[in-house]
Amino acid sequence: MRDVTYPPIIVTAKAAFKVLGQRIHLAGTEHVPREGGVLLAFNHVSYLDFIYGGLAANPSGRLVRFMAKREIFDHAIGGPVMRSMYHIEVDRGEGVASFHTAVDYLQRGEAVGIFPEATISRAMELKEFKTGAMRIAAAAGVPVVPVILWGTQRMMTKDHPRDFSRGRTISLTVGEPLHPTGADPMAETATLHARMSQMLVEAVHAYPEDEQPPGSWWVPASMGGSAPTLEEAARLDGEEKRERARKRAENRAKRQGDK
């Protein structure tokens, strides 16, 4: 792929990280192969995860093609930029096309990024995973490399105001690769979830204590924080989903009434 947009965007992003005085802590990046198809599976706690997530493959000289929801590609400015970076558009109502695109990218030796939770976790811990990550990797015959992001949620996430205060730590922890066969996607997905859950616990405990006091809203309730529990987060997600459906129905009715 001929990358014209991606490299300068990376340079710009790194400059922004420096302006913000951020401390980027990378661990385990040797697990990202320098060549060949690889699927990177990320946890999802922030709207900025895909920006920072690519850093996991940076030491290996790789560019990550992220699978992202269609709405981002529908944006007048964001859409063309995303396409120029060869990211993969995902229609949550019809995911067959994105599945095949991801498999094609991987078989051509690309690094593809995916969020198995599909949406941001309000609980700050792992929600239930979709099986797509393991099915895609198995179909392409490539490894899945788990990656845990931590600290991005402090800047921009659901239900909280944006906060780009200086001097914060952002950590990315890369785990050893998994090699799905596709024989049992549910079991293989459960293995990925368990591996990443343990990595998340380790990432939270390794985060600087002075930046993460007890009761912090960005820390899971199960780890001493005040984020919603998984059950509370699921309820909020359900309410949000119903509200979006209501607004879509209203918009459809309005368009029909205008005809």
Region roles according to the model:
Residues 23-27, 93-99:
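Glycine-rich, highly charged phosphate/nucleotide-binding loops
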